[in-house]
């Protein structure tokens, strides 16, 4: 399940990767805090969430030249938070009980590598992975103050479909057909 784009690829995260993954996410948390954003400022994500992702085989790492530079959870079993959408509708009719979509959560890139287009590369690789797993679309959500993701997602062909509600509030919901 590994794809490569020159010397960059993705693979399932392993237990041995947990500290590196957590350092990447801590860097993202700090970037968001310094930018005055609310997202990821209330103890989520945390090392326990990363461990659960790895144990459930949904943690994915992006690797460049044998170095982990990105992380996300790629979920293909549905997300109940996506069963209800406000101010719009999904492009597909799939829901968490008959899931035919993938979901990207907790995506982060090593903060020292910001501005190199790695988030877009990572998403492209995840889109291809989702295709290979038989998904008909990919869904992702982000906070209203995550300016980078709100810019990147439409640029990459994602359609804003509406608002979903997660534990800590509403999120802009996007979907791309595969």
Give a label for each model feature.
Residues 73-106:
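Conserved acyl-donor/pantetheine-binding loop and adjacent beta-alpha core of acyl/acetyltransferases
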Residues 130-142:
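Conserved GNAT acetyl-CoA-binding A-motif
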Residues 58-72:
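Conserved beta-hairpin
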Residues 109, 115-128, 151-155:
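Conserved acetyl-CoA-binding loop-helix of GNAT-fold acetyltransferases
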Residues 114, 140-150:
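Conserved beta-strand-loop-alpha-helix junction that forms the acyl-donor binding cleft
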Residues 141, 154-173:
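Conserved catalytic-core motifs of GNAT/GCN5-like acyltransferases
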Residues 29-49:
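Conserved GNAT-fold acetyl-CoA-binding loop/helix
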Residues 9-23:
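A short beta-loop-alpha structural element at the N-terminal edge
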